[in-house]
């Protein structure tokens, strides 16, 4: 992208901070795309991904700030709480889909509205980072190195999970033909959850 811009006499990355931001935001988009593509490949488009990410991040920020007041360890606690909250919210979304047997598009729209309503209630419609921002909460993402490490870890985990595990085998079978996969004994419901 920088090369294309340079051919037109423009720069995107003009200093180290610009490079840091480029890698960090590339990591965010890449990881979100990987998460979204998991459902897309199997025919279940999920609109609730953004609301799920926002609600789990706000939950992590609020809890870590309430417990540690933004002090030492707040970023690590926020990360742990955010991951757990994201997993729980994803499980709830999957349970709604499996239990109610509503088409995935309707389920994801409903879950999006519910999660955004909860998010609005928790934050009172205000930007949460003005409340919790301090050096311990934002210092983690200050350099491209952490983003590059996260990209590498996500790629390795994704490759191992989807290419070398029983879950990946079932996922790929369901992705390539749900009816045939189910008829051969692969259980769709645990895979969807």
Where on the chain are the PLM-derived regions?
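Single transmembrane alpha-helix segments in multi-pass membrane proteins
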Residues: 2-6, 15-68, 95-101
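Interfacial loop-to-helix junctions that mark the boundaries of transmembrane helices
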Residues: 12-24, 71-80, 136-148
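Residue-level recognition of pore/gate-forming positions within transmembrane alpha-helices
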Residues: 29, 54-58, 86, 112-113, ...
């Amino acid at each position: 992208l920088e090369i294309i811009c340079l051919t037109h006499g423009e720069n995107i990355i003009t200093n180290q901070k610009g490079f840091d931001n480029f890698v960090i935001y590339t990591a965010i988009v890449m990881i979100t795309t990987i998460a979204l593509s998991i459902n897309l490949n199997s025919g279940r488009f999920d609109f609730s991904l953004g609301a799920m990410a926002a609600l789990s991040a706000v939950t992590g920020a609020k809890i870590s700030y309430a417990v540690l007041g933004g002090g030492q360890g707040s970023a690590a606690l926020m990360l742990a709480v955010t991951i757990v909250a994201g997993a729980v919210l994803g499980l709830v979304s999957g349970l709604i889909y499996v239990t109610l047997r509503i088409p995935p598009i309707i389920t994801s729209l409903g879950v999006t509205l519910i999660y955004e309503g909860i998010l609005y209630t928790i934050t009172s419609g205000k930007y949460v980072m003005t409340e919790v921002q301090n050096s311990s909460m934002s210092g983690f993402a200050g350099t491209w190195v952490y983003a590059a490490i996260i990209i590498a870890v996500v790629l390795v985990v994704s490759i191992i999970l989807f290419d070398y595990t029983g879950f990946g085998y079932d996922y790929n079978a369901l992705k390539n033909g749900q009816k045939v996969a189910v008829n051969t004994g692969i259980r769709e419901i645990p895979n969807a959850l």
